[in-house]
């Protein structure tokens, strides 16, 4: 058992194996980024919130790392940053009031899982029979699309992040999946001008799925259409609508993921009303919350 995993287990004995794997992975990657010259990991260094907060500031999606740092160190600065992220998510939820069409696209997370399970059964059969027909490749592409966009295996990203994802003949102007290192390299995405190139370690379960697809996929792009061209954002929207039998976009899947992840949190309106009644700010109030 790694030093990080052991330390996490000591701090939180009831932490699930899945959470242990996820936290161990993101913490290990963050440590290497903050202390690139260290040959081994010194658990005490994770308490250096100044160094790690600088690294976190460069990340577009630091929630999982922050959660891991809170469990591992119980550091107050990490807890404050995590609380701030929760408030931001709730603010997004409040500001993006769903109109009737958006409400229709909001489905339970369980329905997303069911759709993924159905496609997995079809994909397993195709791999087993070595079917390379256009219909089979179309089904496999849908399966991979949902694996990437559903939020089941990783935090869901925007359509652009996947339409520009190559798996062969790397292009530095586009995104790339490196199967050797199990890493996503994002060069082309909505906030690239702010965050520049972003790399993200692929969760083990997803890596197994993608590596199998890379060997089977004859195309340079991760996702492609029946004519061999890369999928576009409208193509992805159409495919998701077909998969779910209703209008469910990548934006809706991102919203479903956030709503499910923070489903036990009170609404931002409730937080604001309570904070106002107690004459302090929401971040101040959240500092009193111990989880």
PLM regions: where:
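Non-catalytic DNA-binding core/recognition domains of DNA-processing enzymes
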Residues: 5, 9-90, 255, 278-279
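Short, charged amphipathic recognition helices of the HTH superfamily
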Residues: 62-67, 156-164, 265-276
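Flexible interdomain linker/hinge and immediately adjacent N-terminus
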Residues: 80-128
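Basic, Lys/Arg- and aromatic-enriched nucleic-acid-binding interface segment
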Residues: 116-159
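Conserved tyrosine-mediated DNA breakage-rejoining catalytic core shared by Y-recombinases
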Residues: 160-204
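A short, basic/aromatic helix-end/turn motif that makes direct DNA contacts
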Residues: 164-170, 271-282, 286-291
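Active-site/catalytic core of tyrosine-dependent DNA strand-transfer enzymes
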Residues: 201-257, 262
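C-terminal catalytic core of tyrosine-transesterase DNA break-rejoin enzymes
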Residues: 252, 256-281
């Amino acid at each position: 058992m790694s030093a990080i995993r052991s330390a996490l287990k000591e701090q939180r004995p009831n932490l699930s194996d899945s959470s242990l794997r996820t936290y161990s992975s993101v913490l290990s990657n963050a440590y290497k980024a903050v202390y690139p010259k260290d040959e081994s990991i010194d658990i005490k260094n994770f308490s250096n919130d100044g160094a790690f907060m600088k690294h976190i500031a460069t990340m577009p999606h630091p929630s999982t790392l922050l959660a891991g740092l809170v469990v591992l160190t119980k550091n107050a600065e990490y807890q404050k940053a995590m609380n701030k992220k929760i408030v931001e998510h709730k603010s997004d939820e409040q500001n993006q009031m769903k109109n009737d069409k958006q409400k229709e696209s909001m489905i339970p997370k369980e329905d997303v899982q069911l759709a993924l399970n159905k496609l997995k059964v079809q994909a397993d059969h195709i791999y087993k029979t070595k079917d390379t027909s256009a219909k089979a490749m179309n089904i496999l592409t849908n399966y991979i699309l949902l694996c990437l966009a559903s939020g089941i295996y990783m935090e869901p990203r925007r359509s652009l992040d996947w339409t520009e994802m190559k798996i062969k003949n790397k292009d530095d102007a586009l995104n790339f999946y490196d199967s050797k290192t199990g890493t996503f390299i994002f060069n082309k995405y909505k906030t690239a001008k702010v965050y520049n190139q972003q790399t993200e370690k692929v969760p083990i379960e997803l890596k197994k799925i993608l590596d199998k697809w890379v060997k089977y996929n004859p195309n340079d792009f991760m996702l492609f259409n029946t004519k061999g061209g890369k999928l576009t954002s409208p193509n992805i929207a159409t495919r998701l609508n077909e998969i779910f039998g209703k209008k469910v976009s990548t934006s809706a899947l991102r919203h479903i993921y956030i709503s499910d992840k923070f489903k036990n949190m009170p609404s931002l309106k409730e937080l604001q009303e309570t904070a106002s009644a107690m004459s302090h700010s929401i971040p101040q109030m959240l500092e009193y919350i111990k989880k």
